[in-house]
């Protein structure tokens, strides 16, 4: 996948797979330098690959977390015992070469503080197998980015491995692991029917994975997940159906930025597979139902990581020039602490390279021993020296263990001995071998204009950056320079231990140290010692090809030279100065050439500047002090964690394309870059601290200056709860992230006193939206097992506020309409509009006469004119007698009781549907689009006319200048003519020249007119094509919108009809009951016996009558509904019928326009030319001869028939 191309990425990362031999265990001998005792052990790895563990003869178990392992070495690279007795003990039996059976496992919390586990195998093959397997497990990218469920399983595995000799789990280990709240642990154990005394232990079989899960649910209850579960459909039922689960995944968890064709939403069968995987109740799973327990498991499962595994994999295009990548770079790689004192270490080169760094620095100085071996140290400081040769060996050993892409060696060469420089070159050639790139590649010669080769072209290659010997200088001057530097640099051997300045750090190899002013002194302090670099010898020069350091002069000079193999280094202060003064030029420079930024010399504590500053300018090698894990280094680790941890990250497109210019200080949206909107809601935390303290979470954003927001959000501090604090606060919204591909989100947790707990740095482009666990990491970017933050993230393409209403209306038209109506009512209540409306209705005549007309005449080119029948009528034009859309009219009372309760329901007409706000909103949007289109073309036309006016003036001025010269010559000739000796043939020649000049001028005007006419014609045709295409699309959208509005309104009307039917039945019963009461009242006037008989008869007949009337009413209601549905269908068909009609009208309109266009353009050009020539004649700037020739310019205009003949079959409906 080195040359990954855009599209669906095929995941190349392999999940953790532990071989059987590692699971079963193997016998080894463990030894330590500090002791002469060797210990036979059985070494194993758990099936999930979480831990390395071993048991000795006393059956005591020790663990080593594989996430702490940095490297595994065997053979000559493994650590060898120094003590001869120890070596003898280890080589018992002489089974095979001891060196080939030795293994060293390197582990530690960071790059500096490392430890070694030294082992000896009994067979060479076993040593190789274990070395390869352990290194593979330790560097597995999926293992470093496990799901929440996997981290909880890791904690469980640790408890299961740390057992007593009897195979029982001590409860003290559980209390130690979950130490934040002892009382909670005790209660959770009791809930699982387990003993709770700290001194007790439990059998392994009693603490199964299911029991462990129940224990966690009691220890850390999750009410917030219950709320999400019920909110998404499980209110009345204790489960989610497969459809509800599908909606949850597709609506909440899916990234809306993804292409739906390449990354389609999940289907039912795919969701069913997930349910079967995570739902513990098999009977529910078979029915496609998911309980809250299964839902919790899904949220913490591997499918629901906050970053897609594809982003961790090598997924970027690695075939572009080297200058198109950010390259993970180290400064003063050999240092383990500060810049002035402390140890230098060969091991730092191994650790830095293993961590993914691809550019390391070597500060080389002349060795002062008898062997004359060059050394690496920080000059003029009290840091220790290390062997240059050992460093080269270390680089060769670890160069390509974690990444196959090229290594760049940045030499700061102070070795003023030609002999020692020759040694350095020889070591590089011999130790690196074929990996050292000695000659440029055939496809990429060192020539101006040729780009750098790609990381893919340079795979498994080592490139040297060192001063290149100048062939212009003589050999003698070179020797003189070397001798001068020798006397200056090492005049006294003790000078190495005397710091020359507080800023004794690196300097750029191109710094100018000849100036003496204050600015240069400050610059020198920042830049450090590299100004005194030695002259490169022939041997070292021969190693340099694609990375030739040169003194930076200016961006203009670099652009003129156009040599991609030349690069410059900038101390951070100089780099910041260039970034501030010339940001766009800096970005342009970095498209073609490499630049290296390094910390200023005054950072004696090895602190770091923020690398984001220079990534924003496209700087490739932003070198940091890897030994200092501050925020800047954490951001750097977060950056290079992705793309297969290859050490290379492809720069954003605008920082690579030569046809685009990018300003890192931009505050607006960049054309061609889709900005994002990001919303983060911190919901809760789990096991954040091992102490009973309050906790809080902070959110930061880093990116372009406009995107960066430090401490953008902070939750409230939880009160003494670090186990399961719930915040449920309002989300923090990053409304506009201008450059998402270079922005990252940082979520960090702290204890109430401000003590750092853990954090996670996530690239905005890689973040998955939805409900996710953020598994925290420590400041060294190593994963923490238990601490996590549960969040809800929304990420989408940014929509400016101008279009927010349109997007809202499109995404949820009903809610939008309701919201608009609600706002209108609220405003009316505040502005007393209701009373005004009442007054207007009381005197309609006055209103109609006084109210100003607000009706706008739609412009001819506005995109709505072509749909005149779709245009809504303004409210002021609507007659007052017209009922509201979907209103119900009550007819006059009749004797028929059914008709008296039956109300008439009218279907909404097309005109009424067009009054709907969502439809009107779309029309306004289309109007704006057409207005913008016409405006753009008008601007082009204006520019073209200006261009032709300028050309006309040029022709005219040239003509006048030449005519004046001829007339002047004619005057001289006339003077000569008056002399007797002058011949008479001169005047006739001048008249011929003037006539020729006039003819030439006329022809130029004709050519100019023809050209102008053709260009204007092309431009206007292009405009008409655009208009026609836009209008055609608008018709489609408007018809679709009107259809949708009709369906929505009609569905609402049918729902409302059901309510009306129920009301009518109640009204009918009410009226019939009233009649019955009247009859009963009449019967009361009769005698008692007759009254009882009539009352009984009335009740019987009343029941029959009610049944009959209800039946008749239902029949009438049914017929009414059928008529309404029929009318609805008719209206929808009318809407659909409008589409071809409008399209036909549009076609005809533009056929007519295209036919008229050539004549219109011709007339326009002729009038313009006439006017111009006439104006010039009035001002005396055009001679009569030229003005008289104006008629020659007016050519005959072609007829429409001629145009058709010249353009047979010409179609004017082709979209742009």
From Swiss-Prot:
<dbReference type="GO" id="GO:0005096">
    <property type="term" value="F:GTPase activator activity"/>
</dbReference>
<dbReference type="GO" id="GO:1904117">
    <property type="term" value="P:cellular response to vasopressin"/>
</dbReference>
<dbReference type="GO" id="GO:0008286">
    <property type="term" value="P:insulin receptor signaling pathway"/>
</dbReference>
<keyword id="KW-0449">Lipoprotein</keyword>
<keyword id="KW-0539">Nucleus</keyword>
<dbReference type="GO" id="GO:0000086">
    <property type="term" value="P:G2/M transition of mitotic cell cycle"/>
</dbReference>
<feature type="lipid moiety-binding region" description="S-palmitoyl cysteine">
    <location>
        <position position="17"/>
    </location>
</feature>
<feature type="region of interest" description="Disordered">
    <location>
        <begin position="469"/>
        <end position="534"/>
    </location>
</feature>
<keyword id="KW-0106">Calcium</keyword>
<dbReference type="GO" id="GO:0005546">
    <property type="term" value="F:phosphatidylinositol-4,5-bisphosphate binding"/>
</dbReference>
<dbReference type="InterPro" id="IPR028400">
    <property type="entry name" value="PLC-beta1_EF"/>
</dbReference>
<dbReference type="GO" id="GO:0098982">
    <property type="term" value="C:GABA-ergic synapse"/>
</dbReference>
<feature type="region of interest" description="Disordered">
    <location>
        <begin position="834"/>
        <end position="891"/>
    </location>
</feature>
<dbReference type="GO" id="GO:0005634">
    <property type="term" value="C:nucleus"/>
</dbReference>
<keyword id="KW-0807">Transducer</keyword>
<dbReference type="InterPro" id="IPR042531">
    <property type="entry name" value="PLC-beta_C_sf"/>
</dbReference>
<keyword id="KW-0597">Phosphoprotein</keyword>
<dbReference type="InterPro" id="IPR035892">
    <property type="entry name" value="C2_domain_sf"/>
</dbReference>
<dbReference type="GO" id="GO:1904637">
    <property type="term" value="P:cellular response to ionomycin"/>
</dbReference>
<dbReference type="GO" id="GO:0005516">
    <property type="term" value="F:calmodulin binding"/>
</dbReference>
<dbReference type="GO" id="GO:0031161">
    <property type="term" value="P:phosphatidylinositol catabolic process"/>
</dbReference>
<feature type="compositionally biased region" description="Basic and acidic residues">
    <location>
        <begin position="1205"/>
        <end position="1216"/>
    </location>
</feature>
<feature type="compositionally biased region" description="Basic and acidic residues">
    <location>
        <begin position="1075"/>
        <end position="1095"/>
    </location>
</feature>
<keyword id="KW-0378">Hydrolase</keyword>
<feature type="modified residue" description="Phosphoserine">
    <location>
        <position position="582"/>
    </location>
</feature>
<dbReference type="GO" id="GO:0007200">
    <property type="term" value="P:phospholipase C-activating G protein-coupled receptor signaling pathway"/>
</dbReference>
<dbReference type="GO" id="GO:2000438">
    <property type="term" value="P:negative regulation of monocyte extravasation"/>
</dbReference>
<comment type="subunit">
    <text>Interacts with DGKQ.</text>
</comment>
<dbReference type="GO" id="GO:0099170">
    <property type="term" value="P:postsynaptic modulation of chemical synaptic transmission"/>
</dbReference>
<dbReference type="GO" id="GO:0007420">
    <property type="term" value="P:brain development"/>
</dbReference>
<dbReference type="Pfam" id="PF00387">
    <property type="entry name" value="PI-PLC-Y"/>
</dbReference>
<dbReference type="InterPro" id="IPR011992">
    <property type="entry name" value="EF-hand-dom_pair"/>
</dbReference>
<dbReference type="GO" id="GO:1900087">
    <property type="term" value="P:positive regulation of G1/S transition of mitotic cell cycle"/>
</dbReference>
<dbReference type="GO" id="GO:0005509">
    <property type="term" value="F:calcium ion binding"/>
</dbReference>
<protein>
    <recommendedName>
        <fullName>1-phosphatidylinositol 4,5-bisphosphate phosphodiesterase beta-1</fullName>
        <ecNumber>3.1.4.11</ecNumber>
    </recommendedName>
</protein>
<dbReference type="GO" id="GO:0007612">
    <property type="term" value="P:learning"/>
</dbReference>
<feature type="modified residue" description="Phosphoserine">
    <location>
        <position position="1199"/>
    </location>
</feature>
<feature type="domain" description="PI-PLC Y-box">
    <location>
        <begin position="540"/>
        <end position="656"/>
    </location>
</feature>
<dbReference type="GO" id="GO:0032024">
    <property type="term" value="P:positive regulation of insulin secretion"/>
</dbReference>
<dbReference type="GO" id="GO:0008277">
    <property type="term" value="P:regulation of G protein-coupled receptor signaling pathway"/>
</dbReference>
<feature type="domain" description="C2">
    <location>
        <begin position="656"/>
        <end position="786"/>
    </location>
</feature>
<dbReference type="GO" id="GO:0070498">
    <property type="term" value="P:interleukin-1-mediated signaling pathway"/>
</dbReference>
